[in-house]
UniProtKB/Swiss-Prot annotation:
Function of the molecule: Catalyzes the excision of an oxidatively damaged form of guanine (7,8-dihydro-8-oxoguanine = 8-oxoG) from DNA. Also cleaves the DNA backbone at apurinic/apyrimidinic sites (AP sites).
Organism domain of life: Bacteria
Family note: Belongs to the type-2 OGG1 family.
BP-aspect Gene Ontology terms: base-excision repair
Site positions (Important for guanine/8-oxoguanine distinction): K217
Descriptive protein name: 8-oxoguanine DNA glycosylase/AP lyase
Keywords: DNA damage, DNA repair, Glycosidase, Hydrolase, Lyase, Multifunctional enzyme
Keyword DNA repair: yes
E.C. numbers: 3.2.2.-, 4.2.99.18
Species assigned in the record: Fusobacterium nucleatum subsp. nucleatum (strain ATCC 25586 / DSM 15643 / BCRC 10681 / CIP 101130 / JCM 8532 / KCTC 2640 / LMG 13131 / VPI 4355)
Cysteine-cysteine disulfides: none
Amino acid sequence: MKKNEYFNEIEKIYKEMSSHFKERLKEFKNIWENGTNKDIHLELSFCILTPQSKALNAWQAITNLKKDDLIYNGKAEELVEFLNIVRFKNNKSKYLVELREKMMKDGEIITKDFFNTLPTVAEKREWIVKNIKGMSYKEASHFLRNVGFGENIAILDRHILRNLVKLEVIDELPKTLTPKLYLEIEEKMRDYCEFVKIPMDEMDLLLWYKEAGVIFK
């Protein structure tokens, strides 16, 4: 394990931007601490829309669906009309409805209450991967980070993986990312973050910022 030239490059950005990363992560924690069941449900729904779609578009779609409460009571054929800005809109509209049905009790959304019954981050993530259609480890990790549980997990999208190759954390971009390989790369990233003394959730925002020039979600 070493700090290569590329690390020196991103370390400069980190020193300039670390206070912004910390502030953003604090905002994520506040979503969980102060958010309602519906707030947390929106965050989970957002991560269903993100695969192969821009995060900004996915969040815009969620914002539009929230306006008329469609996200909480609309049928799949109604939701799909608002998903033109994300890919795989037909499947994703069905996934949103299935998610809502799972997270509803006595006519009320219980998303935050439900996840509070799963004591660890690992248990929360495993439940999502096994029970929510359209969500793999990447999307589950994304959701958990966005509600303040990202200290020890990785969101291994193509931007992060490409940067892990440049940092020599992994040798090459994986052709497919199986659950086993995901966890192996996550462990390597965890070790590397410890080595360079940059918290894992801050490293994620740093590498995203390096690629996109923005700190979003």
